């Protein structure tokens, strides 16, 4: 269990820190030893999305990998951010 908690924190941190989406292989490559399998990483991503169920963001799979992004229901408010900074 402790390994899964640590794995979750590492993957979550990597997704938040990365400027680009991360592939399953890219996430696995973060680990020098005890590399998680692609299925383990997918399970962690599912767990993160359960954890984020009541938050404004989620982990999504896009063409180039996984990333954390704001859920689509917040577009109305978030679109104002770019207008204000222009």
Where are these regions (language model features)?
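Short capping segments at the starts of secondary-structure elements
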Residues: 14-23, 36
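Short amphipathic alpha-helical interaction segments
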Residues: 36-45
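Amphipathic alpha-helical interaction segments
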Residues: 9-13, 43, 61
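Charged low-complexity interaction tracts in eukaryotic proteins
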Residues: 3-6, 31, 46-76
